UniProtKB/Swiss-Prot annotation:
Segments of this protein annotated with the region Interaction with CDK5RAP3 and MDM2: 1-63
Name used for this protein in its record: Tumor suppressor ARF
Taxonomy of the source species: Eukaryota, Metazoa, Chordata, Craniata, Vertebrata
Domain of life: Eukaryota
One of the GO biological process terms: apoptotic process involved in mammary gland involution
Length: 160
C-alpha cells in the first residue's frame, strides 16, 4: 500500500564527533512511483523543524545574530519602534521627540497607551524581544546541522 525507505542521517555537532542516525520512513497511500527528489524533499522538510528546535541558543553569538540587529541595512528594532522618532532629519522639534509620554504631541501629561515607557517593545533583553531575529539565527540552524547520507528502498518492501 505504500513505500518504505531507510534513511541515514549524519548530525554534525560542534565540539563533538558527528552522530549517525538510521530510521525508517513509510509513505502510506498510493503505491504509484514517486520521484526520489520529491521524497527526499519531504524528508528534509520533516527533519527541518527538529533541527531548528535542537539547535538551542548559541554560547557566543556573533555580531548581528542575537541583539535584534543586522550587520547591514535597517534594523528590525527600528521598525518595531514606530513611535520612537530617531535622527536629526525628522521635521518635529527635539522637545516633541522627547515628550513625557514618549510619543509626539503628548507633552505635559501621560500619553495614552504606553505611558512613560516609550516604545515598550524596545525595552528589556534583546533575546526577549518579539520578532524573527530574536534568539538564534534560523539561517545558521538550517544549513549547519544534518546531511542526508544514504537513501535506499527498504529491503522487506512488498508491492500490493
Amino acid at each position: 500500500m505504500g513505500r518504505r525507505f531507510v534513511v541515514t542521517v549524519r548530525i554534525r555537532r560542534t565540539g563533538r564527533s558527528p552522530q549517525v542516525r538510521v530510521f525508517l520512513v513509510q509513505f502510506l497511500g498510493s503505491s504509484r512511483p514517486r520521484s526520489a527528489n520529491g521524497t527526499r524533499g519531504f524528508v528534509a522538510l520533516v527533519l527541518r523543524p527538529e533541527r531548528i528546535a535542537r539547535r538551542g541558543p548559541q554560547p557566543h553569538p556573533g555580531p548581528g545574530d542575537d541583539d535584534g540587529q543586522r550587520q547591514s541595512g535597517s534594523s528590525p528594532a527600528l521598525l518595531w519602534c514606530r513611535f520612537e522618532l530617531r535622527g536629526p532629519h525628522h521635521p518635529l522639534p527635539t522637545g516633541a521627540r522627547r515628550s513625557a509620554g514618549g510619543l509626539p504631541r503628548h507633552s505635559g501629561s501621560t500619553a495614552p497607551g504606553r505611558g512613560a515607557a516609550g516604545c515598550a517593545r524596545c525595552l528589556g533583553s534583546p533575546a526577549a524581544r518579539p520578532g524573527p531575529r530574536a534568539g538564534t539565527s534560523r539561517r545558521r540552524a538550517v544549513f549547519a546541522v544534518s546531511t542526508l547520507l544514504r537513501w535506499e528502498r527498504f529491503p522487506g518492501h512488498r508491492q500490493a
